[in-house]
């Protein structure tokens, strides 16, 4: 029990550590680190704290919570939003807190959605990741003023395989969900 409470404390402190100037500078050095590395780390921290803390879940809030999490995530993928995290420390703090909340909400409420809704959402979300990746990779103009065009292209080409991988995972889940096991037939 004591080790779980220590683990909770470490997970809760990790987003705070990301706001320290030296650690923040490491993630802000390149666009892939900021928009992909830090984002995934915050999503994982939110997911982990949701799994370690027993919260009461309300099924009626599941679709709203997943929608809110999606909109928050997509907001921080917009180039102007990424620029704001570089210019204003308060926007960076909001970025950290909101992506932590996105991980928490998705981990907490995703399992409560019906199977078909999870599949549809997963296919849509992974397609949006691929679309953002292609947008960043194919643009010959600078979308994010805080980073170089090369970093923007690198970030875009990292998002494309990530989105395609998530898409394949969702399809694998869908086939498992649609096809009944042989033993139960």
Predicted regions and their residues:
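Alpha-helical membrane segments of multi-pass proteins
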Residues: 1-185
